[in-house]
UniProtKB/Swiss-Prot annotation:
Source organism (scientific name): Human immunodeficiency virus type 2 subtype A (isolate BEN) (HIV-2)
Span(s) of short sequence motif PxxP: 104-107
Annotated region (Disordered), positions in chain: 1-72
Signal peptide: none
Protein name: Protein Nef
Region (Acidic): 88-96
Residue ranges with Basic and acidic residues bias: 15-35
UniProt entry keywords in alphabetical sequence: AIDS, Host cell membrane, Host membrane, Host-virus interaction, Lipoprotein, Membrane, Myristate, Viral immunoevasion, Virulence
Length: 257
């Protein structure tokens, strides 16, 4: 993308971050990954990603994004304000929630490998998804935002079935979903905020897992979804129909006859 494109993205990114913040609330204590390791807000993982080999997208100027509780420590008052804002947004209409035009600003287009990588790095630079709890509502926010602001047809954001790590099925999208367990501290802190995605994520997921987005630069080179779970691609897998259907059935994944 050229300079003009990056300016356009920088301007409109603020809208996406604000809407995600409103649906997010704030960071809550520590999380535990599926293996039992404890960490806070994925900050350590985020730092490692900076030094890992990657298919770098467009570089963006730092300091353009608003302060957020997962980048800067929030005061107790800020935490309370974020929580209340999240509560107030629960019954909001999607159009009001997203704050984007009814029709796309640019011609509609399909997602491409390069576009997926550029969008992934752009969102990472703005801190928009890292360590954020996944929910169907946030899934919609991301779909609708990219459709209205970038013209991207919302048929690309799919993840492997699970349980465990959910890999993006669109090659080039560098955000996977990782299963985490909330610490006791976080569970108690969220007891009075049951509509927060940390609580609703497990209900959205058929495996009952709490999921967060995590950036993985190696997904630009390694098509993990297809390598590990080709049966989820059905006829596109290259497997005999009988074989991929049998694998889906064994994993309890429904499919159309």
């Amino acid at each position: 993308m050229g300079a003009s494109g990056s300016k356009k993205l920088s301007k409109h990114s603020r809208g996406l971050r604000e809407r995600l913040l409103r649906a997010r609330g704030d960071g809550y204590g520590k999380q535990r990954d599926a293996s039992g390791g404890e960490y806070s807000q994925f900050q350590e993982e985020s730092g490692r990603e900076q030094n890992s080999p990657s298919c770098e997208g467009q570089q963006y100027q730092q300091g353009e994004y608003m302060n957020s509780p997962w980048r800067n420590p929030a005061t107790e008052r800020q935490k309370d304000l974020y929580r209340q804002q999240n509560m107030d947004d629960v019954d909001s209409d999607d159009d009001d929630l997203i704050g984007v035009p009814v029709t796309p600003r640019v011609p509609r287009r399909e997602m491409t490998y390069k576009l997926a990588i550029d969008m992934s790095h752009f969102i990472k630079e703005k801190g928009g998804l890292q360590g954020m709890f996944y929910s169907r509502r946030r899934h919609r926010i991301l779909d609708i935002y990219l459709e209205k602001e970038e013209g991207i047809i919302p048929d690309w954001q799919n993840y492997t079935h699970g349980p465990g790590v959910r890999y993006p099925m669109y090659f080039g999208w560098l955000w996977k979903l990782v299963s985490v367990e909330l610490s006791q501290e976080a569970e108690e802190d969220e007891a009075n905020c049951l509509v927060h995605p940390a609580q609703t994520s497990r209900h959205d997921d058929e495996h009952g897992e709490t999921l967060v987005w995590q950036f993985d630069s190696m997904l630009a080179y390694n098509y993990k979804a297809f390598t590990l779970y080709p049966e989820e691609f059905g006829h596109k897998s290259g497997l005999p129909e009988k074989e991929w259907k049998a694998k889906l059935k064994a994993r309890g994944i429904p499919y159309s006859e």
